[in-house]
């Protein structure tokens, strides 16, 4: 049986993001949210970190039902050229039972 996968991430927008119109930015973000929903994934936490670090604007946690959903979501990020607009870091993990 597959178990949930958690993606811990940090990010910041790159200059190309600010070259997009507000409508284009909103369209990309909407497609990301739709992809999460379609895969049964969700953002469980999204934090503004801009005030505490000069490297990242946000950090958060996404929960995916399985590793296949993570892989499909990453494919969506590539299709949307997310790496052109965002610099980030992420790590995947599973829940540690204590």
Describe these PLM feature segments.
Residues 60:
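Conserved, mostly hydrophobic/aromatic
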Residues 1-57, 65-71, 75, 93-98:
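Short S/T/G/P-rich N-terminal loop/turn motif that feeds into the first structured element of a domain
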Residues 75-82:
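Short, surface-exposed basic-aromatic patches at helix termini and helix-loop junctions that form
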Residues 82-94:
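Conserved short beta-strand edge segments in small beta-sheet-based binding/regulatory domains
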């Amino acid at each position: 049986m597959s178990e949930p996968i958690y993606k811990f991430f940090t990010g910041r927008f790159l200059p190309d993001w600010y070259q997009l119109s507000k409508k284009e930015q909103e369209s990309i973000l909407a497609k990301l949210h739709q992809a999460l929903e379609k895969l049964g994934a969700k953002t469980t936490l999204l934090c503004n970190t801009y005030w505490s670090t000069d490297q990242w604007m946000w950090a958060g946690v996404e929960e995916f039902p399985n590793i296949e959903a993570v892989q499909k979501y990453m494919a969506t990020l590539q299709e949307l050229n997310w790496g052109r607009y965002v610099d980030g870091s992420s790590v995947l993990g599973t829940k540690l039972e204590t």
